[in-house]
Structure formats: structure tokens, C-alpha cells
Amino acid sequence: MTQGIRINVNYRWDAADYEKHSSPQQQWARDVIRTLKLAGAERLLDICCGDGKITAELAALVPDGSIIGIDSSESMVAFAHQRFPPAHFPNLQFRWGDATRLAYHHEFDLVVSFASLHWVSDHLAVLSGIKRGLKTDGRAVLQFGGKGNAALISDVANEITTHRRWKGYFVGFAYPWFFYSVEEYDGFLKRVGLSAKRVQLIPKDMVHDGKEALMGWLRTVFLPYTQRLPEALREDFVAEIASAYVERRPQDENGDVHVQMVRLDVEATL
């Protein structure tokens, strides 16, 4: 497995744009949060917290506890801090942090991460850091893209990178995401000494309100593709992906565009 972290290091994230186009991820995180059964005094860590909205929702569930949200994008951390200021969220902190270099020791009752860890190349480093950071009776609850996630739209995007107009920009391009199977992730947990309570692939239907909304999502999350291009060409590239995708997967009777996603849900303890 390659070393280091890919999330947010070379990509210029637009936190405000991400907030606008991440409602499916937020809803899927809420589905998990409803199962957490928090008592209200726990200490939490949210890895790759992004724009901070899920972290803030978790803060409200632990009024007598606290939560730290970390992200390796300075723009995301700044956005989250401004959107959820300490004056209104006294038990919530946002910090810059590298998911592969967690420097916490026996501090957290719960470590979470939502819709982010598929950007990280070295999951053994992430899981080792989580293990160090958990209290003896702590647990980790993680959700991110799993094997088969966004397969069709990724195939479409990769095919378009071979077209004459674009192929010169994608010499040496490597697929940027890491989508694992249940068996692979079970193996990672065992290697770092965490006990798997649940590792499950869950299909999800991401629904976009038309082709323009699909393009907004592509602009937000397909940064490994678009940021290889001159800025003046990015919108054309995104539009070409969206058009090719709806040819392969037509809009439904309401004009919505469906993208089949797969989440890997993980719960583990010491």
C-alpha cells in the first residue's frame, strides 16, 4: 500500500461549493449518527470533517462532552470555524490535521469519519492512529466509499480522459480513490489490532436534481480530474462527463439523475 495521504494535499477545495453539493453525504452520515446512542458526555474526534456541518450536529449530541474536527484542507477548516464559531459551539473545535498522522493518545470515546477516507491512500496509518486515540472502551465508526462506488460515472470520466481534446492533460494520471471490499478492510483492522464489530458494503442511490446539479457535484468532488486542466477548460470537461453519463444512465421521469454509490460502513473497537 502506498504511503502518505492524498486527501486535500494537492487539491484546492472550495468549501462553500462543497457545502452546496454534499447533501447526500450529509444524509448518509445522519443515518449512521442515529445509531450511535450517545449519552451526551463523550469526547469525540471527527476525521476529515470537511465543512464541519456533521461535526456541529455531533457537538449538539454531546452537550456535556466535546468534539474535535480535523481536516487537511486549510480552507475547509477556516470555513468550518467561521460557520460554527466557538461562541455558539463551545464544545466544538476545528483543527488542521493529517488523518495518517493522528497524535492523540487514549483521548476519545468515539472516533468518526464520514464520506472522506476513500481519498486516503494509507489506511493502516489512519487505523493505527485511531487505535492510539481511543480510550480503552472506545469505538470507531467510519463511513466512506467502498468497492464499486461511483463505478459508472468513474468509467465515463476515465473514458473521456482518453479523448483527443483531453488526453494530453492526463498523462501519468492515477485513479485517485481507494474503494475497499469487506474482506480487505477486515484485514486492515486485524493488522492494526482493532476488533471489527461491523464491516458492511451498503448500496446508495445519489440523486441529483437534473444535469446541472450533477455538474455541480462533479465540480466539487472530481478535483483530481479537473485540476489537471487549465481553469478555462474545466467547465467543458465537466459538461462532457455529465452529458456522456446521462446518455448511459438517462434521467428519470422527474428529470433527476441517479448515480449508484456504495458506502463501506465500519465499526470497530479495541
Regions found by a protein language model. Name each.
Residues 196-253:
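C-terminal helical/coil "lid" or tail adjacent to the Rossmann-like core of SAM-dependent
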Residues 43-47, 51-101:
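Class I SAM-dependent methyltransferase SAM/SAH-binding core
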Residues 100-111:
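A short acidic, Gly/Pro-enriched loop at the edge of an enzyme's catalytic core
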Residues 2-42, 53-57, 76-79:
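Conserved class I S-adenosyl-L-methionine
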Residues 216, 263-270:
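Core SAM-dependent methyltransferase catalytic element
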Residues 139-209:
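Conserved catalytic/acceptor-binding region of the Class I
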Residues 110-123:
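A short SAM/SAH-binding and catalytic strip from SAM-dependent methyltransferases
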Residues 124-139:
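A short glycine-rich, Lys/Arg-flanked "PGG" loop and its adjoining helix->strand segment in the class I
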